[in-house]
Amino acid sequence: MASTENPDPETGKSEPIPASATTPPPSAASFLDCRKIDVIIRVLLFSATLTALIVMVTSDQTEKTQLPGVSSPAPVSAEFNDSPAFIFFVVALVVTSFYALMSTLVSISLLLKPEFTARVSVYLASLDMVMLGILASATGTAGGVAYIALKGNKEVGWNKICNVYDKFCRYIATSLALSLFATLLLLVLSICSALSKRTP
């Protein structure tokens, strides 16, 4: 076994080699692990936003309801494009889903070409925060309208509709839950980016 001590030419005694001199340089394994985790989170983000988008645009439901001035019930459809808040929500899901796909491909490419990581990571971190703001605001806005659809508002004469359009409301609730999960993933990505910048 190789000795970790150097003999002193004056005293003839061995002196211990500093620990820093025997410690191997940090490997790239930890860096690759971080990039792999980043890719996994972005894949989850894409899956969540795409699923939320599909569920939202397929939430249409038609039921026969009694309309004022009409003697017999008439078929009335409930669609996401009936509400500007839901339209904004769908647009936000489209944008975020597309961004998640593109950023996943970029993150995978950084595994193959790590020399571009520092510069590209700055752009990804900034865009992550932008997407976080867009998706969070859209989710909150759509959630407010969904709550009125569920509970109604007697003070302003807004009736609840979820007792009639149950499938429509279930789909919206599922889409909102997936969007909230995607928002949390974007928050995790933003926090990880901030912590990685502070790490020496």
UniProtKB/Swiss-Prot annotation:
GO CC annotations, alphabetized: plasma membrane
Subunit structure: Homodimer and heterodimers.
Transmembrane segments: 37-57, 86-106, 130-150, 172-192
Chief place of localization: membrane
Keyword Membrane appears in the UniProt entry: yes
Recorded superkingdom: Eukaryota
Listed InterPro entries: CASP/CASPL (IPR006459), CASP_dom (IPR006702), CASPL (IPR044173)
Subcellular localization, as worded in the UniProt entry: Cell membrane
Region (Disordered): 1-26
UniProt record similarity statement: Belongs to the Casparian strip membrane proteins (CASP) family.
Pfam families: CASP_dom
Keywords, ordered alphabetically: Cell membrane, Membrane, Transmembrane, Transmembrane helix
Recorded topology in the membrane: Multi-pass membrane protein
Cytoplasmic side: 1-36, 107-129, 193-200
Extracellular side: 58-85, 151-171
Entry protein name: CASP-like protein 1D2
